[in-house]
Amino acid sequence: HKIAKWAKENTKSNYDCVIGVSGGKDSTKQAITARDKLGLRCLLVNFQPEGITEIGSKNIENLKNQGFDVMSIRPNPKIMKLLIKHDFFKWLNPVKATEFALWSSTYIICDSFNIPLIIQGENPGLTLGASLTGVGTDSNCLNAEKLETLSTGWKDYLEIEGVEEKDLFLLHYDRKSLESKNVKGIWLNYFLKEWSNFESAKFSEKFGFESRPLSTDPNSIGTYVAEGSHPGTYFQLDTDLTQVNQLLKFIKFGFGQCMDHACYDILEGLLSRDEAIELVKKYDGKCSSNYIEKFCNYISITTEEFWNTAEKFRGNMWQKDDNNEWKNSVWELLK
């Protein structure tokens, strides 16, 4: 509560804090906690993803209706399409550009409105052990630019024909300006003992957050739905682009979101290791062909081009077996 008290005393604006939100489980919890537990006046900033889903639209509208001021930001869709296509072919990571904009939009609004405090949800350095990326394991979220995706600078996009620096304003923030104003940025999970994905989903459902039905086909989203904490019902709801990205992650690194979710659930004591391994081998890397076709149509490529490009990035954990089928050596480690 010390930091909340500091924000209220030091604000030069109508707001004590700014929070980046999608309307998903985590941002719903962040916003409600900041307002109701910490007593902060919050300005919510919503980065609208490309191809927002019906459930994603419902959830962001639901969060607005909980009684918040919300600014929605959507970078030029024509430019975003160029960036997403570029990132697919260059990095096999079609969500890279959206992550730049997703993070930066909150910081830009904070700077423009002179708001003293930025609240983010989960520090990957703390929960995933990703601290070697430079983001650290402390409470300071001004380090967000050091996250794996964001550290490969946005200037990379200037090599794209038809893209100028002015087009990329919403993709980067001025950390020096924020620091000169003594802006503080915190990861909320650093301060909350009861932070978990499952807990955030349960908490947010009480405030109208809607998840996928339990009848969802786990093969379509590449993770389990009925077991453990039911992650398939509440992860990655606002755009189908993330499902395609998880498939591509699986091809590059040998694991997708099912592995991520199973690790969380083992930590939470909601799955045994054996149950988790079985689920990973069943669903990891699966993705509905509808999502793939939708993505190919969006960036104007054929599905053949999609698969040929994905193959170029296939990680060395994949080996061909005697039947000429790909075998994932990561799974050999799951004993």
Protein language model annotation of sequence segments:
Residues 29-30:
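Hydrophobic positions on the alpha1 helix immediately C-terminal to the Walker A/P-loop
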Residues 1-16, 33-335:
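Nucleotide-activated chemistry modules centered on ATP-dependent adenylation/adenylyltransferase
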Residues 17-26:
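Short, glycine-rich nucleotide/cofactor-binding loops
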